[in-house]
Every structure is written in C-alpha cells, then in structure tokens.
C-alpha cells in the first residue's frame, strides 16, 4: 500500500512546546517520514492546511502543510470535537492516543473483568461508603477521576484512636478529624465538586525508607503489536507518598536487585510484563480508544504482590532523559506511525 505523503503530525498544546517535542522525535525518526509539530489553533479547516514547525536543511522552519497521513497526539485532554474533525479529514484510526486523559473509574471497571487480583478496591467516592472502606482498610486514597501527576490526591488514614488523618502529597497530616462524623461533615468541602474515586491503600515496599513506583511503558512498534519498552521507578521525596514528587528515577531492575535475590526480582518483572500486556489487550478491546502507547503504574506490596495503581494515556517522556539507552522511548511511536501510514 502506498504511504502517500508519508507525513506525520505531532499535536501539542501550544507553540512553545513544538520545538522541544519535535526535537525528541527527530533524533530517532523512522526513515521515510516527514515530521512536523502543530497546535490545535494552527489548523486552517477551510483551506485544509496546517501551520507547523519542522526541521529543514539543519534549520527550524515554520511552514504550511497538507493534513498529515497520521497524527500522534501529545496534547493532554484534547477537545473531542477537534479529534473527530481530524479523524474525518485523515481517516478513521489514523490519529493515535486521541484520548489520553483516562477516567480512573472507567479504567478500573474495564481492567477488573480480567485483572481484579492486581487492582486495589476502588469505587466512586461518597461519604458513607468512604467510612465503611476506612473501617475495613484503615487507609484510603481519594483521587480526582480525571487527575494526573498526583494533583488533588488526598490520603485518608484511620488511627486506632478513631481519629482520621487527612494529608496531601506527604504522610504528615494537614487536618485531623476526631471521628467519622467530623470526617463526613467536612470531606466534601475539601474535595469540592470534582468527581473523585476512593482507592484502598496498599502497604507497599520501600527503598531507603522511601516510597517508589514501577512504571511500565507499553508501546506499539513497527508491526502494530504491543510490547513493554522498559520499567522505570521514581523514588519519592522523603516523607512523600506521591511519586510525582521524586528525587530520583532509575531502571526498576536496579531497585529490585537491591531488595530481592535475582530469582525474586525476575519473577516480579515477569509478572509486571504479563499484567501490562494484558492491560494493553483490554484497552484495545474498547473501540473508543486508539492507543499507540500508555504507561501502567505499579506499586509493590510488602508481600511482593504487584498492584496496578493507574494507567496514563500521555506518558511523561522527560522521566527517561537521565536513563541510558532510552532512545527507543521516542522511536517506537514513530515506528507505529509508519505502520499506520502503510495500513
């Protein structure tokens, strides 16, 4: 099948992001692709042209482009109407990661059909059920249904005395309620009108007395099939439960090798690979999504069990900048874009 113009457009939120994002993908660009970066406001629908930034003869150049054959969406929380219009212009399933802001409740519902053993108890927030879950688990995380990077997350912990401690980002409490009645009377004012979920708190493994996560980056490659690109861990700042506030990022293998003998570390890694790929298969079953990549954040329980904490539809690529030999992180989306050009 012909590749037509073989062009790929990377959609970003604003003009200031164009050069930074494009530079990352040009370094590992697949052959025979013309790559440019554009924003929603740079589309001229009447003339069917796009103003985009590209690299030409060693220079950064802004120019006019026809609609590309494939669009890679790196614009978070994209307007659905924009995606629908782009799909009508370039063809069905030629824009990938068009939905990249996931509903945590919807993801939980989808994954729980097949992966319930790896999911903490999760439900839409309401005051009455929150108290029941607190009595059962003693530790809850309240999360915005559409949140990211730990923003808006509230940790709720019930003490043996009956006190309820409320904290954000760090374990130290910001607010202390004397009992469940005080909690129920006040928690909605803390959360506001944003829809929240509540998630069971898991007693998780630490390294150097710090929380860490394991992020599996799952990407499609030149054959359109899923694979796990790497596992990277963020080690949270001292006293923080939010790994988006981290002091160090490294390959997860390094941490697991410190905590466990090789056979246990390898068993944990195999489990994470298997669960991540199963998650990808489940996401592909939903016709509303067309993903070329996403990440799965895991927590490791004290009993060595792996728990899915959340899925991210716009993986943070700067996380990999200090990690050696990670150019494949940027290469894979271009390989998948080339696959879409020919299929």
Map each language-model feature to its residues.
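Extreme N-terminal starter segment of soluble prokaryotic enzymes
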Residues: 2-8
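Phosphate-binding site of ATP-dependent enzymes
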Residues: 135-139, 146-147, 151, 158-248
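Rossmann-like NAD(P)H-binding beta-loop-alpha module
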Residues: 117-154
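Residue-level signal for well-ordered, solvent-exposed loop/turn and beta-edge residues enriched
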Residues: 59, 224-225, 305
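C-terminal active-site "lid" helix and adjoining low-complexity regulatory extension at the edge
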Residues: 253-292, 300-343
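Conserved N-proximal alpha/beta basic substrate-recognition cap immediately N-terminal to
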Residues: 15-129
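Short, solvent-exposed loop/turn elements at beta->coil junctions and helix N-caps
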Residues: 127-128, 201-205, 295-297
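Active-site and channel-lining beta-strand-loop segments
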Residues: 217-218, 295-301
């Amino acid at each position: 099948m012909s590749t037509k113009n073989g062009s790929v457009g990377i959609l970003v939120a604003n003009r200031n992001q164009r050069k930074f994002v494009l530079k990352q993908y040009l370094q590992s660009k697949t052959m025979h692709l013309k790559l440019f970066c554009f924003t929603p406001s740079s589309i001229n629908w009447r003339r069917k042209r796009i103003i985009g930034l590209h690299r030409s003869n060693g220079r950064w150049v802004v120019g006019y482009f026809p609609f590309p054959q494939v669009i890679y969406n790196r614009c978070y929380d994209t307007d659905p109407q924009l995606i629908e219009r782009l799909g009508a212009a370039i063809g069905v399933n030629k824009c990938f990661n068009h939905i990249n802001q996931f509903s945590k409740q919807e993801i939980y519902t989808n994954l729980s059909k097949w992966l319930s053993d790896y999911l903490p108890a999760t439900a839409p927030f309401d005051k009455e059920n929150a108290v029941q879950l607190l009595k059962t688990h003693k530790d809850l995380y309240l999360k915005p249904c559409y949140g990211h990077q730990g923003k808006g997350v509230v940790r709720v912990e019930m003490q043996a005395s009956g006190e309820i401690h409320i904290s954000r980002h760090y374990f130290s409490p910001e607010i202390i309620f004397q009992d469940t009645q005080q909690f129920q009377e006040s928690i909605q004012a803390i959360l506001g009108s944003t829809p929240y979920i509540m998630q069971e708190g898991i007693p998780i493994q630490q390294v150097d007395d710090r929380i860490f996560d394991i992020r599996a980056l799952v990407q499609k490659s030149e054959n359109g099939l899923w694979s796990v690109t790497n596992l990277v861990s963020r080690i949270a700042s001292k006293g923080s439960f939010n790994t988006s506030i981290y002091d160090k990022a490294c390959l997860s293998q390094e941490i697991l090798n410190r905590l466990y003998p090789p056979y246990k570390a390898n068993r944990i890694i195999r489990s994470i690979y298997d669960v991540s790929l199963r998650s990808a298969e489940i996401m592909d079953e939903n016709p509303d999504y067309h993903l070329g990549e996403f990440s799965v954040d895991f927590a490791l329980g004290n009993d060595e069990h792996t728990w899915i904490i959340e899925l991210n539809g716009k993986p943070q690529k700067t996380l990999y900048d200090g990690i050696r030999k990670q150019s494949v992180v940027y290469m894979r989306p271009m390989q998948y874009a080339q696959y879409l050009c020919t299929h």
